[in-house]
């Protein structure tokens, strides 16, 4: 009878460890996409800043937009897919909604169709480049059924719409500042989500 109590306690501790691992994975489900797309937005802003100081040609900026976001989107989904796989292997919580396999395959399959059949999306994106990461965050949120990511996608989409009108008004530095603020906001959100994740539980040894 005495030997059964430590065994039962060890079982409960194991269940608690599994629960904590799943909570950590859920937090990373939020923090990883915000980190990836926040970094991509900031990199895009830096590229635009370098172009603005190097040339006054609007065609150069448009060329960057045509190339950057399709490639950056591919890098983003591949990075998230690899991250989710590493979390599943390390914490043993499985892929579940954190798996980006279908999203990655769908992105690469649909990208040529978008280029050929929905070219106006790219043209519109020239005037509101934040709409591209907003759409990708929305796709991730839909895949994971995650409310926080849906709110983040909506906020980025609103920023993209504002950027569209700022571009139409020919205010050169305002869209760049908006992208920097948006990217920084996503990174801050990622850091907050990561800090809220429980620390890795220590291994427990049953007393026999």
State the predicted function of each range.
Residues 98-99, 103-158:
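Membrane-proximal helix-loop-helix units in multi-pass membrane proteins
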Residues 41-48, 73-76, 111, 133-137, ...:
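Helical transmembrane-bundle signal
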Residues 46-68, 116-130, 161-180:
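Membrane interfacial helix motifs at helix-loop boundaries and amphipathic/re-entrant anchors
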Residues 135-208:
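Terminal transmembrane helical module of multi-pass membrane proteins
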Residues 27-112:
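Selected alpha-helical membrane-embedding segments in polytopic membrane proteins
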Residues 69-83, 106-119, 159-161, 180-195:
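Hydrophobic core of alpha-helical transmembrane segments in multi-pass integral membrane proteins
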Residues 1-30:
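N-terminal juxtamembrane cytosolic/stromal segments of multi-pass membrane proteins
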Residues 7, 90, 123-126:
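Intrinsically disordered, low-complexity segments enriched in small/polar residues
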């Amino acid at each position: 009878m005495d030997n059964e109590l430590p065994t039962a306690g060890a079982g409960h501790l194991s269940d608690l460890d599994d629960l904590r691992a799943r909570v950590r994975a859920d937090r990373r489900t939020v923090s990883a996409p915000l980190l990836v797309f926040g970094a991509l937005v900031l990199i895009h802003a830096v590229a635009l800043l370098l172009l603005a100081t190097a040339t006054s040609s609007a065609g150069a900026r448009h060329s960057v937009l045509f190339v950057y976001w399709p490639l950056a989107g591919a890098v983003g989904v591949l990075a998230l897919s690899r991250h989710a796989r590493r979390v599943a292997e390390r914490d043993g919580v499985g892929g579940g909604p954190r798996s980006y396999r279908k999203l990655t395959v769908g992105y690469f399959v649909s990208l040529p169709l978008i280029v050929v059949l929905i070219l106006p999306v790219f043209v519109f994106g020239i005037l509101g480049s934040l709409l591209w990461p907003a759409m990708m965050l929305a796709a991730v949120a839909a895949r994971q059924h995650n409310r926080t990511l849906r709110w983040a996608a909506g906020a980025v989409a609103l920023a993209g719409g504002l950027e569209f009108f700022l571009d139409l008004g020919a205010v050169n530095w305002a869209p760049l500042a908006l992208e920097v603020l948006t990217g920084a906001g996503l990174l801050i959100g990622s850091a907050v989500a990561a800090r809220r994740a429980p620390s890795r539980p220590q291994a427990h040894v049953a007393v026999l």
